[in-house]
Amino acid sequence: MMLGMVLMISPAVAADSLPPALQAKVEQYKKKMAEWAADPAIVAAVKEANARGSLAGMSNSKWLEVDEKSPTSQAFTTSKAGLIIKKWEEDKQINKLVVRDEKGNLVAASTKPLLYNNAIRPVYINAMKGEPWAAGNIAPDPTTQVKSVQASAPIMDGGKVIGVVHAGITTE
């Protein structure tokens, strides 16, 4: 019984395990991402993506086969929203910035992300609850392999969550 209690407590302890300076940085970027999520061009891109739906036949396994320089991949980084987030990602404290629609599908990105859809990932699930979120641990970013803390913020329209902006916050 005591072991069970320790195991139940341990995830909460892990969530508070970031060094204070890094935790402050993460909180700063959660606020910044909430501002970015409210950018009218980002909101418009997500609304359009939600109305249009995902790329026909695209899945995460097919996305892995898409070359980073292909027109399909480049469409996400060179769109109006893609160019905006590429500009924001020039901030070297983040190593990736991605916009997702209401189903977790890719809308725009600063670089080709590993996944086309991340609807089952905590970075998406938690922001879809309507509040900025950040992981409580440091791990290599799945796309960039840079040590990061994953963070996200909801994209809102009329009080409804319509998508997510997420980033890898560089830890070094």
Language-model features: locations:
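Sec/Tat signal peptide C-region and signal peptidase I cleavage site
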Residues: 8-14
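Juxtamembrane extracytoplasmic/periplasmic/luminal helical "stalk" adjacent to the first N-terminal
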Residues: 14-69, 91-93, 133
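A short beta-strand signature within small-molecule sensing/ligand-binding domains used
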Residues: 145-154
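Extracytoplasmic/periplasmic sensor domains and loops in membrane signaling proteins
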Residues: 70-84, 111-140
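Helix-start (N-cap) segments at beta->loop->alpha junctions
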Residues: 167-172
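Sensor-regulatory modules in signal-transduction proteins
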Residues: 141, 155-157
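Short hydrophobic alpha-helical segments used for membrane anchoring or interfacial signaling
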Residues: 96-102
